[in-house]
Amino acid sequence: MLKFLKQVGDYAKEAVQAGRYIGQGLSVTFDHMRRRPVTVQYPYEKLIPGERFRGRIHYEFDKCIACEVCVRVCPINLPVVDWEFDKATKKKKLNHYSIDFGVCIFCGNCVEYCPTNCLSMTEEYELATYDRHELNYDSVALGRLPYKVTDDPMVTPLRELVYLPKGVLDPHDLPANAPRPGARPEDLVEKTEA
């Protein structure tokens, strides 16, 4: 009988220990459930890139003088400039200009050193395609006006992705009425005024 009671006691101890382990695991789960999400609902919410963001390059064909400075300063000699010398005007005539964004490292040297400012960086960063050859933009594709996140009525532009305010190291120290991630400054002002 003592052996049976010892087995029951050991079983009870193991059951309590198993319950503690499960409780520890669930405490971590519940701890994360109380935290605020850090995600952005991407197709419908997009972060507005910073002022100096280096996105897709915009090209103005009329300003280009075919000097090929962009090719010389590019670390990978990426822009392809095709020109011919016009004997009548004694100037270079630009025939074709293209950049392959599948290879481009978006360093911005071409934009910085262009003497006529025909190249500029845009805030467009959605360059995904199914075929890498579609990333080779010619002068027509480069000349398209850049897409702006703030102009799309179907997208909620987010100024910044807010998770923890400055100085806060533990997410559990935040008050319940703290701003959610991606809150726009206008929304924050409305909440503080209310």
UniProtKB/Swiss-Prot annotation:
The keyword Iron-sulfur applies. InterPro entries: 4Fe4S_Fe-S-bd, 4Fe4S_Fe_S_CS, NADH_quinone_OxRdtase_chainI, NDHI. One of its GO terms (cellular component) is plasma membrane-derived thylakoid membrane. Binds 2 [4Fe-4S] clusters per subunit. [4Fe-4S] cluster 1 binds at residues 64, 67, 70, 114. [4Fe-4S] cluster 2 binds at residues 74, 104, 107, 110. The keyword Thylakoid applies. Residues 183-194 have a biased composition (Basic and acidic residues). Belongs to the complex I 23 kDa subunit family. This is NAD(P)H-quinone oxidoreductase subunit I. It comes from Nostoc sp. (strain PCC 7120 / SAG 25.82 / UTEX 2576).
